[in-house]
């Protein structure tokens, strides 16, 4: 099994790239992490609700094109389930033991995720009700994936 992180938009800030690279390096071959960046749709300043929904659907179609049959899909959503690090570790472990495909985490674009992506998801995770920049959320999620692996291996990293 591989863990994939499908994200909408390009990561620009060096400090975030460096932080993510550090956790990816630490994970090594334990449970490989692949990050897939998808181009975000350009949103006109005066986009109507209908136009915004069409853009969100196009981004959703791009996301779903990266999901294979058998993959376990966890999306980040403000209204999702609040989880502890231990609960996330349990989810990762079950996907590793019982899964038939990869474990895929998704961070959507500034418009959020399409209804189709929500319907395909196996789990909706919330990191709280606060809005965080999508690029910062990548670092937070990658750290939590690393932490989950350390919990599952009985490491002292998680205290």
Curated annotation (Swiss-Prot):
<comment type="subunit">
    <text>Homodimer.</text>
</comment>
<keyword id="KW-0963">Cytoplasm</keyword>
<keyword id="KW-0808">Transferase</keyword>
<feature type="binding site">
    <location>
        <position position="108"/>
    </location>
    <ligand>
        <name>S-adenosyl-L-methionine</name>
    </ligand>
</feature>
<keyword id="KW-0489">Methyltransferase</keyword>
<dbReference type="InterPro" id="IPR029028">
    <property type="entry name" value="Alpha/beta_knot_MTases"/>
</dbReference>
<comment type="similarity">
    <text>Belongs to the RNA methyltransferase RlmH family.</text>
</comment>
<comment type="function">
    <text>Specifically methylates the pseudouridine at position 1915 (m3Psi1915) in 23S rRNA.</text>
</comment>
<dbReference type="Pfam" id="PF02590">
    <property type="entry name" value="SPOUT_MTase"/>
</dbReference>
<keyword id="KW-0698">rRNA processing</keyword>
<protein>
    <recommendedName>
        <fullName>Ribosomal RNA large subunit methyltransferase H</fullName>
        <ecNumber>2.1.1.177</ecNumber>
    </recommendedName>
</protein>
<dbReference type="InterPro" id="IPR029026">
    <property type="entry name" value="tRNA_m1G_MTases_N"/>
</dbReference>
<feature type="binding site">
    <location>
        <position position="76"/>
    </location>
    <ligand>
        <name>S-adenosyl-L-methionine</name>
    </ligand>
</feature>
<dbReference type="InterPro" id="IPR003742">
    <property type="entry name" value="RlmH-like"/>
</dbReference>
<dbReference type="GO" id="GO:0070038">
    <property type="term" value="F:rRNA (pseudouridine-N3-)-methyltransferase activity"/>
</dbReference>
<feature type="binding site">
    <location>
        <begin position="127"/>
        <end position="132"/>
    </location>
    <ligand>
        <name>S-adenosyl-L-methionine</name>
    </ligand>
</feature>
<keyword id="KW-0949">S-adenosyl-L-methionine</keyword>
<dbReference type="GO" id="GO:0005737">
    <property type="term" value="C:cytoplasm"/>
</dbReference>
């Amino acid at each position: 099994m591989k863990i994939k992180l499908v994200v909408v938009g390009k990561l620009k800030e060096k400090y975030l790239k460096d932080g993510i690279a550090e956790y990816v390096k630490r994970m090594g071959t334990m449970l490989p992490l692949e990050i897939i960046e998808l181009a975000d749709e350009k949103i006109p300043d005066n986009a109507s609700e209908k136009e915004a929904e069409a853009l969100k659907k196009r981004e959703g179609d791009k996301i779903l094109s990266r999901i294979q049959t058998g993959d376990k899909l966890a999306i980040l959503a403000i209204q999702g389930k609040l989880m502890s690090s231990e609960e996330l570790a349990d989810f990762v472990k079950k996907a590793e033991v019982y899964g038939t495909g990869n474990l895929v985490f998704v961070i959507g674009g500034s418009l959020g995720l399409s209804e189709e992506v929500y319907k395909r998801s196996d789990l909706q995770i919330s990191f709280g009700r606060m809005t965080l920049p999508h690029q910062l959320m990548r670092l937070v999620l990658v750290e939590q994936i690393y932490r989950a692996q350390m919990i599952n291996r009985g490491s002292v990293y998680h205290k």
